[in-house]
Amino acid sequence: MKYLTDIGYYDDILPQKYGFEEMRVKKYDVGDSFDTHIDVSDYASARRWLAFLVYLKDNFSGGETEFVDGKMIHPKTGTVLVFPSLWTFPHAGLPVKSGTKYILTTYFHYV
């Protein structure tokens, strides 16, 4: 974990035991979207610490990931979006305008 100390973070901020949730591939067709939400909303999801979203292709229009602070992530094949899964990061998947969007998602967990 030396790279963390190089940027001013220390091992004690990371959970002592951790793991990843199963990966899911999601398909969004024209008009499909995901309304504004947070990724930790109940007991079952309470162990989520970081969200990972991988854009698997970008030959479609629309489908951006938008955070409520106005930050917009435009899909690009191979890009990995990582952000805290907490209530402080509500976000939405905007509607796909043409083509088909594929993403892979997983979460870093406290165990």
Which residue ranges define each predicted feature?
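Fe(II)/2-oxoglutarate oxygenase catalytic core
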Residues: 1-80, 88-111
